[in-house]
């Protein structure tokens, strides 16, 4: 499976977790995720983050948000 297919497969679960945790709409969750360092790393093939589980990636995102607060 290529990287973009892998990302497209797990992204919906990541976004659902963010939506549920932060009470956001899908668009808001997508914007928040891709505006974060975690989202940037997820989009970058060189980091390999796309190969991790949705739980791991959403956990990284939520930890990043806690640290920013």
What are these regions (language model features)?
Residues 1-69:
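C-terminal alpha-helical interaction appendages
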């Amino acid at each position: 499976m290529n990287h973009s297919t892998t990302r497209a497969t797990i992204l919906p679960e990541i976004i659902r977790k963010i939506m549920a945790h932060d009470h956001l709409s899908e668009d808001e969750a997508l914007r928040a995720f891709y505006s974060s360092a975690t989202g940037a790393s997820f989009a970058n093939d060189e980091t390999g983050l796309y190969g991790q589980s949705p739980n791991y990636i959403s956990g990284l995102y939520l930890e990043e948000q806690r640290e920013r607060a």
